[in-house]
Amino acid sequence: MHTLNKIIIENFKSIEKLELNLHVYTPVVGYNNAGKSNIMEAIDWFLTQGRLDENMIRNGSKPAVVTGTITGVSDCLIEELDEKHQKQIGPYIIDGNVTFRLEQQEPGGAKKLRTLTVRDPEIENVDDENAFTTNPSGIPEALSKLFPESIFIRAMENATDDVANNKSTTTIGKLIKQITDPVKVQHEEEIKDAIGSIDSLFSAEGDKRVDSFKEFDRIADENITNFFPGISLKLHVPAPTIDDIFRQGTVKFSEDGEELRDFALLGHGAQRSIQMAMIKMLSEYGLNIDSDSRKFLLIEEPELYLHPKAILVLRNALKKLSKAGYQVLFATHSPLIITKEDIADTILIRKTNDNGTYRLSSVRESVKEVIKENENQADALFELSNSTKLLFADRAILVEGKTELKLLPALYKIISEKEDNQSNVVFIPLSGSGNMINSSTILKTMDLDHLCLVDLDFCFKVACKKGLLGAEDEDIQAILTLFAKFKDEGKYELDNEGLPTKNSLTNTPA
């Protein structure tokens, strides 16, 4: 299925220029006010082509621009467009890939202020002024067909207004629509019969009109004849359509079997929990819609106000949605909602006053840059994916194994008089010292501050062989001299390289 695979955001709020690789399930991690929400707003604007306020344009002398590349576009999906639009947009889809660009310089919501273009594959240079064209009609229709719905759940929006009102622009309205669309299809005939019963009672052409309406018709006819002979007047109250009925839907709550009450009476935590419960419902009941289109779900801090157990439930729901027609992007401060499988592709966001919002290299990108052999890449990925805390830390301390992991946090607490999580320090155990250098280089590529804590044998078995230390280093030579001295005292044996080894006679370990 197709995916919004790459997004480039330019001149949008805190973002000067930012390029992101997206997946069907993409976590975004960063400090407060680093620009995570701005990324989501930019993607939402690109998909909905909605209003752009003045504060959304970083530099007023240039347009805000979002460029998105969609991969995996199937012929079947394009065939759902009308024939004219198929012919117009078809040449711009190469090997299932198509790139759109949305830009706007003046703030406002008018459609004429926005320009949506498509990348012309015949022009190789993307910086060429003709690389993106507005000529083919059907560009907006094609993008809307690929992503007909963008659901954006913000962290600090008014959940009361959102959940209590089912409007097409509200989160609850969009969620209810996703959940009820299959219901409408499944029960369409029953609903039509019920509406038909109402229509027969109150419409002007109803065959079972209520007596009071018939009386109104009679009196109206008598009076209208005096002014317009031959004219008949009937009271008409149209029955609601199926869409009218579902459009009015909202949610109410009851507690311990009491009467239903308005959602606004709940606390913020309960309100947020209900929003997330709707997401879980969507993952269970809203997946049977027969459509090749993908929907985009954007969530800020899905863990907000939730109990840790509820966070795990929500995580599973989001995973399930990402495998059933939804592309999910969320910003989080919680390691609980990110699994080991997600660490490699998690987007890490930072911000400076001069350059605005930027991203660090992901674990997967850094591994590929540092380690060229595929089999060794897998080993390094596994090592660094053992702790989701890595994504949230200011500093990492790489250690050789699990023994150090049990001991060092306790020592850190005693020495610093702080818990490791208070200082945003994370200890990452590796399976021995063999991957220490690669792991350190990967973290350096990611621009993550870190230290390596190793046993003494690392100096001889790894550091000297990898060129980190010279064999003639004075400290190395001093230690070898000590080894020889202790050997003469019968404390242990030495191997051919002058390093301690097990004493076979006394069975004393090195």
Where does each model-flagged region fall?
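Glycine-rich phosphate-binding loops of NTPases
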Residues: 38, 74-196, 260, 373
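Short alpha-helical segments and helix-capping/turn motifs at coil-helix boundaries
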Residues: 48-53, 127-143, 234-237, 260, ...
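Extended helical coiled-coil dimerization/tether regions that scaffold
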Residues: 159-166, 174-299
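Short glycine-/polar-rich loops that comprise or flank the Walker A/P-loop
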Residues: 61-66, 96-98, 146-150, 326, ...
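Switch/communication elements of ASCE P-loop NTPase nucleotide-binding domains
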Residues: 1-48, 246, 252-389, 405-406
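Acidic, divalent-metal-binding catalytic cores of TOPRIM
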Residues: 351-510
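Switch/connector loops and helix/strand junctions flanking conserved nucleotide-binding motifs
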Residues: 74-80, 110-114, 160-164, 338-340, ...
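Flexible phosphate/Mg2+-sensing switch loops adjacent to catalytic phosphate-binding sites
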Residues: 48-68, 76-81, 284-292, 329, ...
